[in-house]
């Protein structure tokens, strides 16, 4: 290799090592916050860092889930009773203390397990110095004092840490054998936690092929994926982030989906393969007690962003031979994004639905000049009035907003600021139109800890306070209903307490609305619609009180009982499971154009799999419950349909604000407004 190429390679290696530093800081934040599964008292991360910044709740939860996913995969390997000695080889270990956490764990007996941490020689030398300088970590592995005399490596009975470039497979094989691995008789687990993904395609394939030649080898690779193409806003920001760091994700470009990752392992010699996204791990494999404890650590409401993160990472497990193989997923569920391959045959593959296109399509139109003064907001409240749209609250780049804007639909449009002192700087409030000139703003939150119960009326251009809810509410869903000439508002109260409430416009008070179905009253972030034409409604998406996805789609009606009180009566609609998956979203919005028996569901964050662009907008025909796609014109910069407000006026669909923070990679914020025109497909 020329001197120029050597310098280039060393420069790339340094950039990859920087990602290790960032990862350890984030995991240290998880530990410091007290997330479950991280020992209180002794820090496993502090010896490797000079500072301990606190990350955002979204980043903390993401890294905690990543750690739990790796541990889950390792535990399945340790539980697999083969009678053999086990070896766990962490390829690109960096400063990760996984081996120390497992060696000091009382959950599993690691007496017959030997750990090998492998990385660049410079990284390992620093790692060894840090371990030796910390009495807690050194006490775990250095009790027998059998370490390398020159101080650059550690070699003890059950732990080895040594430097080796993963491209030098002959050297790696020789070192592992030298330090005790018996390739013929040991069960070996190779871990790569966002490490091999930085290797060029040919190099990573050589590594995987080399691993497969051992008779009882297994893998746990944790890597990025792009399930909805690289044009998806989250994937786009993620890829750009790593490229700017000088660490392009070569493995992601070559194998962007779980289907392509399956092929990667199969063609390189593995007889048993399981590939799943981390969303599947979170929804189906993560211990529910751990998730409950996680909720108690710090306030959290970034669910859309969290699900984007979960759906853009994969867990790859493979066994070189069927003899000795074990499962990560024992009983596959149709909602899982999961593939299982067993020697020449795909046993489980959850293929997405192919939507039939609707008679509608949405064509991008120019934004009225007057809207340039409207800020870009996340989670604003948006409501249609007779010939205008009102936008209130939300989160701007300057913080939470209390401002309200009245946007006229007449002529070329106009915008007027109509903020009043009674409004609160908040986001996530529910808003419902009572009639053509009246709407109600309900609840919302100032922060994840400060939830509101206020109700504010806007009628004929004037604001007024109304009786508050019986309890605080945000992430709620609401609809207006007419019955015998009277107006009512039905509210699914959302977080934090749930339940159903009903507002009578004539009595001007809230009451509990009776409903016996927890699939209805316990949801938050759901899409609620009422058809005045059919005198029935539909409910889809959302999460329950345990923050678990609800996939059942309900039809609901309002029944007036003898005691002059309404009751919600529901039935589960018999949709194909792939339709249920498609409609399982949080934060989606509903509009209709003329015929309210054909609501259009727009956007939201899917809770089982990433929504493809052609699936962002779907029409549910409540007459026969057929579901069709509504094609949205794709532009160079795709908006992200989460945390937005929506208006459907005439034949125009108007998206206000929206966007998301893309984990620790950056943000993707929409323009202040995006307009579409409904046309025949």
From Swiss-Prot:
Q: Name one GO biological process term.
A: tRNA methylation
**According to its UniProt record, which reaction does this protein catalyse?**
7-[(3S)-3-amino-3-carboxypropyl]wyosine(37) in tRNA(Phe) + S-adenosyl-L-methionine = 7-[(3S)-(3-amino-3-methoxycarbonyl)propyl]wyosine(37) in tRNA(Phe) + S-adenosyl-L-homocysteine; 7-[(3S)-(3-amino-3-methoxycarbonyl)propyl]wyosine(37) in tRNA(Phe) + S-adenosyl-L-methionine + CO2 = wybutosine(37) in tRNA(Phe) + S-adenosyl-L-homocysteine + 2 H(+)
| Compositional bias annotation for Basic residues | 1-11
State a single Gene Ontology molecular function: tRNA methyltransferase activity
List keywords of the entry alphabetically: Methyltransferase, S-adenosyl-L-methionine, Transferase, tRNA processing
Keyword tRNA processing found: yes
Which SUPFAM superfamilies does the entry link to? Galactose oxidase, central domain, S-adenosyl-L-methionine-dependent methyltransferases
Give its E.C. classification number.
2.1.1.290, 2.3.1.231
The pathway noted for it is:
tRNA modification; wybutosine-tRNA(Phe) biosynthesis
**Record carries keyword Cytoplasm:** no
Q: Name one Pfam family in it.
A: LCM
Please list where the region (Disordered) is annotated.
Answer: 1-21
In the UniProt record, which is one GO cellular component term? Answer: nucleus
Please tell me which top-level EC class this enzyme sits in. transferase
Q: Where does S-adenosyl-L-methionine bind?
A: 66, 92, 119, 165-166, 193
Q: Which Gene3D superfamilies does the UniProt record give? A: Kelch-type beta propeller, Vaccinia Virus protein VP39
State the similarity comment: Belongs to the methyltransferase superfamily. LCMT family.
Protein task: Probable S-adenosyl-L-methionine-dependent methyltransferase that acts as a component of the wybutosine biosynthesis pathway. Wybutosine is a hyper modified guanosine with a tricyclic base found at the 3'-position adjacent to the anticodon of eukaryotic phenylalanine tRNA. May methylate the carboxyl group of leucine residues to form alpha-leucine ester residues.
Name recorded for this polypeptide: tRNA wybutosine-synthesizing protein 4
């Amino acid at each position: 290799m020329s001197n120029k190429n050597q310098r280039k390679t060393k420069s790339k290696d340094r950039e990859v090592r920087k990602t290790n530093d960032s990862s350890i800081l984030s995991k240290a934040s998880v530990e410091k916050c007290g997330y479950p599964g991280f020992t209180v008292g002794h820090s496993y991360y502090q010896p490797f860092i000079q500072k301990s910044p606190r990350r955002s709740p979204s980043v903390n939860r993401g890294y905690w889930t990543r750690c739990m996913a790796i541990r889950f995969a390792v535990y399945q390997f340790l539980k697999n009773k083969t009678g053999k000695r086990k070896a766990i080889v962490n390829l690109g270990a960096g400063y990760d203390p996984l081996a120390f956490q497992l060696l000091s764990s009382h959950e599993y007996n690691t007496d017959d397990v030997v750990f090998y941490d492998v990385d660049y020689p410079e990284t390992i030398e620093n790692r060894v110095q840090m371990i030796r300088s910390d009495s807690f970590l050194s006490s775990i592995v250095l009790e027998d004092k059998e370490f390398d005399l020159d101080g650059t490596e550690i070699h003890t009975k059950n732990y080895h840490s040594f430097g080796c470039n993963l491209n030098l497979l002959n050297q790696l094989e020789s070192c592992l054998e030298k330090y005790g691995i018996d390739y013929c008789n040991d069960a070996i687990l190779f871990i790569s936690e966002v490490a091999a993904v930085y290797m060029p395609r040919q190099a990573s394939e050589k590594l995987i092929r080399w691993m497969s030649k051992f008779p009882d080898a297994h893998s746990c690779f944790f890597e990025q994926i792009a399930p909805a193409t690289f044009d998806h806003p989250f994937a786009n920001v993620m890829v750009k982030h790593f490229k700017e760091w000088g660490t392009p994700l070569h493995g992601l470009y070559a194998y962007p989906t779980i289907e392509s990752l399956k092929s990667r392992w199969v063609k390189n010699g593995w007889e048993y393969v399981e590939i799943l996204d981390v969303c599947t791990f979170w929804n189906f494999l993560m211990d529910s007690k751990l998730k409950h404890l996680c909720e108690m650590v710090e306030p959290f409401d970034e669910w859309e962003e969290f699900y984007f993160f979960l759906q853009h990472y994969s867990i790859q497990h493979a066994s070189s031979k069927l003899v000795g193989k074990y499962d990560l997923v024992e009983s596959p569920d149709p909602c899982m994004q999961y593939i299982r391959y067993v020697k020449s045959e795909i046993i489980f593959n959850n293929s997405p639905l192919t939507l039939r296109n609707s008679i509608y399509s949405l064509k991008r139109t120019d934004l009225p000049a007057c809207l340039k003064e409207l800020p870009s907001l996340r989670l604003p409240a948006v409501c249609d009035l007779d010939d205008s749209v009102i936008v209130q609250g939300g989160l701007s780049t300057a913080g939470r907003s209390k401002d309200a804007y009245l946007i006229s639909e007449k002529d070329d449009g106009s915008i007027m600021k109509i903020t009043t002192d009674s409004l609160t700087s908040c986001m996530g409030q529910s808003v419902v139109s009572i009639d053509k000139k009246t709407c109600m703003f309900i609840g919302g939150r100032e922060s994840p800890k400060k939830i509101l119960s206020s109700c504010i009326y806007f009628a004929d251009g004037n604001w007024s306070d109304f009786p508050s809810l019986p309890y605080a509410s945000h992430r709620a869903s609401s609809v207006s209903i007419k019955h015998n000439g009277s107006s009512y508002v039905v509210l699914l109260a959302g977080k934090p307490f749930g339940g159903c409430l009903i507002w009578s416009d004539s009595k001007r008070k809230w009451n509990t609305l009776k409903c016996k179905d927890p699939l209805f009253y316990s949801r938050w972030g759901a899409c609620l619609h009422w058809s005045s034409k059919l005198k029935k409604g539909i409910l889809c998406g959302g999460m329950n009180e345990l923050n678990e996805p609800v996939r059942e789609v309900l039809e609901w009606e309002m029944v007036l009982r003898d005691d002059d009180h309404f009751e919600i009566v529901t039935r589960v609609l018999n949709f194909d499971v792939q339709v249920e998956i498609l409609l399982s979203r949080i934060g989606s919005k509903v509009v209709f154009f003329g015929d309210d028996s054909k609501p259009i569901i727009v956007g939201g964050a899917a809770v089982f799999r990433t929504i493809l662009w052609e699936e962002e907008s779907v029409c549910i025909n409540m007459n026969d419950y057929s579901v069709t796609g509504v094609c949205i014109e794709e532009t160079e910069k795709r908006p992200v349909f989460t945390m937005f407000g929506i208006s459907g006026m005439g034949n125009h669909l108007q998206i206000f604000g929206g966007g998301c923070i893309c984990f620790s990679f950056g943000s993707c914020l929409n323009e202040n407004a995006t307009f579409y025109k409904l046309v025949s497909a």
